[in-house]
């Protein structure tokens, strides 16, 4: 089944460029159409840097964040007026250490951050139970303390965008009936 879906997706894409910005604009356009898809995924690689994250030499983390910004802008262009109903959710597979290592980078860590954007987001804010950055407030005295289960954030986005009940999402999507609300 997966191979059939994959092949159909490839056939539907035609000859559009495969860079993240072009794919985001294409996906936004498809999602803006009546009966179009309700979600898409764009993967951005090269964030797992351990050196030169902010010193302007080599792999610069700022360039990668600009790419995220450009992909969100491409979604917005593609969505057109459907942008007003959109939610864009960024995810990462692992956190980073709080302190910089000896090569101007950070290493794999525990806690992380996410970014939610889109036209349906009406208020800028940070959603966190912020413990602080003092050593005794860090996980194992080196990482951000994870205080919110990111699945709860995903569930809230699904709830808002698809109008589904939180408890249904918790039990049927995340298989955790005790998943807290955010």
Q: Model-found features: residue ranges?
A:
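Ligand-binding pockets and gating/stacking loops
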Residues: 1-182
């Amino acid at each position: 089944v997966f191979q059939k879906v994959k092949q159909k997706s490839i056939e539907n894409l035609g000859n559009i460029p495969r860079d993240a910005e072009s794919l985001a604009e294409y996906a936004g356009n498809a999602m803006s159409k009546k009966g179009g898809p309700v979600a898409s995924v764009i993967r951005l690689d090269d964030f797992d840097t351990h050196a030169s994250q902010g010193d302007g030499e080599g792999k610069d983390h700022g360039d990668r964040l600009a790419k995220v910004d450009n992909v969100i802008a491409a979604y917005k262009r593609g969505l057109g007026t459907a942008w007003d109903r959109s939610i864009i959710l960024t995810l990462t597979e692992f956190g980073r250490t709080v302190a910089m290592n000896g090569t101007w980078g950070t290493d794999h860590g525990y806690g992380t951050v996410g970014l939610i954007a889109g036209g349906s987001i009406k208020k800028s804010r940070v959603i966190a139970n912020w413990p602080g950055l003092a050593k005794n407030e860090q996980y194992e005295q080196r990482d951000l303390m994870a205080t919110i289960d990111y699945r709860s954030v995903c569930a809230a986005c699904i709830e808002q965008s698809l109008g589904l009940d939180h408890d249904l999402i918790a039990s049927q999507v995340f298989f955790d009936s005790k998943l807290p609300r955010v």
